[in-house]
Amino acid sequence: MEYNHQEIEAKWQKYWADNKTFRTGTDKNKPKFYALDMFPYPSGAGLHVGHPEGYTATDILSRYKRAQGFNVLHPMGWDAFGLPAEQYAMDTGNDPAEFTAENIANFKRQINSLGFSYDWEREVNTTDPNFYKWTQWIFTKLYEKGLAYEAEVAVNWVEELGTAIANEEVLPDGTSERGGYPVVRKPMRQWMLKITAYAERLLEDLEEVDWPESIKEMQRNWIGKSVGADVTFEVAGTDKSFEVFTTRPDTLFGATYAVLAPEHDLVDAITTPEQKEAVAEYRRKASLKSDLARTDLSKEKTGAFTGAYAINPINGRKMPIWVADYVLASYGHGAVMAVPAHDERDWEFAKVYGLEILPVVEGGNVEEAVYTEDGPHINSEFLNGLDKAQAIEKAIEFLEEKKIGKKKITYRLRDWLFSRQRYWGEPIPIIHWEDGTSTALSEDELPLVLPVTSDIKPSGTGESPLANLTDWLEVTRADGLKGRRETNTMPQWAGSSWYYLRYIDPNNSEALADPELLKEWLPVDIYVGGAEHAVLHLLYARFWHKVLYDLGVVPTKEPFQKLFNQGMILGTSYRDHRGALVATDKVEKRDGGFYHMETGEALEQAPAKMSKSLKNVVNPDDVVEHYGADTLRVYEMFMGPLDASIPWSEEGLEGARKFLDRAVRMIENSEIKAENNGELDKVYNETVKNVTERLDLMYFNTAISQLMIFVNAVNKAKALPLEYANGFVQLLAPFAPHIAEELWVKLGNEAGISYVAWPTFDESKLIESEVEIVVQINGKLKAKIKIAKDLAREELEKIGRESVAEALEGKNVVKVIAVPNKLVNIVVK
């Protein structure tokens, strides 16, 4: 008999809401557990089945920890500023605030339908002035510390979006992550955050957190620490010079040309008249490319000769100076010494332009291919014969002694481009005065509320639409000095860089959060979300947290103690013979195969990311309606390891529902007795032990497997002790909370399973109390019998003879060999 999931789930969701069951515990005598989801951007599309995977994981842990006696903070909120809402508003003429509010209501409805145990009294919304007052407050603190500053920088400008975007938001093909629009480089006045001031700490403190090694490595690579030397090169025949940063000063003898970034200040001054036109044209083309496109290793190398030469400081040789876009103005000093024998990009460039390739490390044929392995130095005078480490040390000594270079540490990490030329974001709380000074708003002037307007199209001047709102824009100080508010707004990353702190004290109007509460709840114990946020969000949040730590606002160096990245739930999709993906509505199934409806071509089934274009997005509303929220939760946790990417399967969903139906039948149909005959002792105690251990490890799929093993065992047993029925329902509750609440009451318990103490297991019951032995006559198997474990030899012999009494009739027993817990062999004549 199937249970009515719609009725049961609605009933218990109402019970939890009415009773405020999941209000955060405040008992100071209990340990704390802070389970955090990466809060969603509330898009118009609503949730898809990928969202609940991570949310279910944190919900299971939260329910488990409540039952273990923890105060649990499990909140949810909305990352609601940003480009998508504004783009939608511009396309449709709707107000982004209204659109966002509708989307949030829909997301909240969907989330509640899945039975997640969020404390909704903690809900935050990044677009709420009571929230972004503190985002702005953090900005003013960054400004006071010199960590927020204005600079004229070449930005990634996207004409279609009317805004500049960060390097991290530019795709490898040179288009924008949002919308796939062309990105061009354009100098503009921008707000920058000095994340580089924290580079070393961001690197070092990765050792203190329990994060996937792959994510740590991505952050290390993004920060990109390099130890090397700054080397000064003079320009031949002039009084000019430039600096180069190199991680390999030991290869200076192999430097045969120099390359300047197209934006380098020296280019105009040193380019000869004959080369001016070619260099100017090259620089123009380079200005249209993004940094990512320029540094793409696979692209063909291009450049222009300046006509000038540098002097190699280690041997006095002249080296031609080129301009090439594979060198970025923002890295090192915007100049490189090219060692084509031992650097792939330099080698490719040298091959294109016929430049000298001089090996200085032994091994390989550098005319045929670049040699990047280690080896003894050659062609390097006083460095000859030394290995890499020795040669680097000696080269730096030489440079410092001659005052032509010095040891240097650099980072790939660039300062964070923080301003956006858009409307739908937090206003930056700065006023620019007509006397050329700028001031930040004081705390009592915050929040600086985003003004309501129907005109949110980009201004076209490079400023945001706020530049059009003169009533809001123009201010006059008490002494009559006139000023203009900052018109740029903050990027979407701003609110998400600190939102986890506001959950701790969401209604505080006097401070970002109460220091005592921050001390009580930080750091976050488990943070679950997608690996796509490895660099941006996680790095920015760590940076802001460290600034707040330095200000004495937060008590911990790191925000998130443990990070877990759930895998992706893939959709069903199909490929044709060319490997092209075919939308599901163009596919028909017949004769056990899949065919293109229009062409009749046989297609291959292949999992792919769910997308609207492939029409393979599964809406959780449909799953909840047909199968129930508990089924969806159990299925998504049973699909495989939580961090694996696995294709969605309707059959798997049906399997999860069948398991829940069997669990219900087990409770409803078993003979449940107060007394215990011991028959299920071992499997029950194993189940409690295994489920508990696997929850601690987040091995949710194998925890569910163990629950299935228990159900199978009960179906073969004569009776189910009430204690074990209750215990099973408690173990099921984190995974399938609605049906567990229902079964809990059916077993005669008071409503409300959430805070009932988690079951414990008896170690002694994990040991088999019975063993199966074989009984042989003259070495031939005659019977298998179950007996009490560790019986004395005499007792064993007696039971063995009795079990084969018929076969022994008329025979003369010579001797009986009994091996405890194994066998009885009766020798007869």
Curated annotation (Swiss-Prot):
InterPro entries: aa-tRNA-synth_I_CS (IPR001412), aa-tRNA-synth_Ia (IPR002300), Leu-tRNA-ligase (IPR002302), Leu_tRNA-synth_edit (IPR025709), M/V/L/I-tRNA-synth_anticd-bd (IPR013155), Methionyl/Leucyl_tRNA_Synth (IPR015413), Rossmann-like_a/b/a_fold (IPR014729), tRNAsynth_Ia_anticodon-bd (IPR009080). It catalyses: tRNA(Leu) + L-leucine + ATP = L-leucyl-tRNA(Leu) + AMP + diphosphate. A motif ('KMSKS' region) lies at residues 609-613. SUPFAM superfamilies: Anticodon-binding domain of a subclass of class I aminoacyl-tRNA synthetases, Nucleotidylyl transferase, ValRS/IleRS/LeuRS editing domain. The keyword Nuclease does not apply. ATP binds at residue 612. GO terms for cellular component: cytosol. PROSITE patterns: AA_TRNA_LIGASE_I. Pfam families: Anticodon_1, tRNA-synt_1, tRNA-synt_1_2, tRNA-synt_1g. Keywords: Aminoacyl-tRNA synthetase, ATP-binding, Cytoplasm, Ligase, Nucleotide-binding, Protein biosynthesis. Belongs to the class-I aminoacyl-tRNA synthetase family. This is Leucine--tRNA ligase. It comes from Lactococcus lactis subsp. lactis (strain IL1403) (Streptococcus lactis).
